[in-house]
């Protein structure tokens, strides 16, 4: 199973983002751009990669323990821009404010520690967490892109659950399935 742990967005929030994405779509008419489907939008906290079925109980236990330690996980977004920062643009992101990145970094550190304590093996990403939602992917690094894309989009929601997700890779793109949800307290 190809697994990751994420925060999913409420439908109301996705609808607001969808309106903003529809406004920027024409900018990319002459580019090979893949727009992420609305039903795939989420904030990945930890990517676990391929995990054997026998690891599932320990993964679920880790997520439950971690979610129970966090309350009021408020997610604030500030703009749509190219990503990743400081590198050639390969994506268009909805970026989180610094405070959101800091809070989610704290969540990620605790989650990763708990997974390791419970015997889960995965490739750790020790970079500082940068809260973002991938809206568009470019298959290859592109040369000239439409003028610098920074579109303010102030948007907030209260995350209610930390979710175990499975990624199904298909020729039409990845499809994500929620396997379990754990409430923040």
Sequence positions of predicted segments:
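Histidine-dependent nucleotide/RNA phosphoesterase domain, centered on the 2H-phosphoesterase fold
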Residues: 1-185
């Amino acid at each position: 199973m190809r697994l990751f742990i994420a925060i999913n967005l409420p439908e109301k929030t996705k609808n607001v983002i969808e309106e903003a994405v529809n406004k920027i779509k024409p900018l990319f008419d002459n580019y090979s751009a893949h727009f992420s489907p609305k039903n795939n939008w989420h904030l990945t906290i930890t990517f676990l990669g391929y995990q054997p079925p026998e690891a599932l109980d320990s993964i679920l236990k880790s997520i439950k323990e971690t979610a129970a330690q966090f309350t009021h996980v408020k997610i604030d977004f500030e703009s749509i821009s190219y990503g990743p920062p400081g590198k050639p643009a390969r994506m268009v992101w909805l970026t989180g404010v610094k405070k959101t990145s800091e809070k989610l970094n704290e969540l990620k550190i605790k989650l990763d520690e708990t997974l390791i304590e419970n015997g889960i093996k995965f490739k750790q990403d020790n970079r500082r967490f940068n809260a973002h939602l991938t809206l568009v992917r470019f298959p290859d690094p592109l040369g000239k892109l439409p003028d610098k894309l920074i579109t303010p989009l102030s948007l907030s929601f209260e995350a209610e659950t930390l979710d175990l997700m499975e990624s199904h890779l298909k020729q039409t793109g990845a499809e994500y399935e929620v396997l379990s949800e754990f409430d923040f307290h």
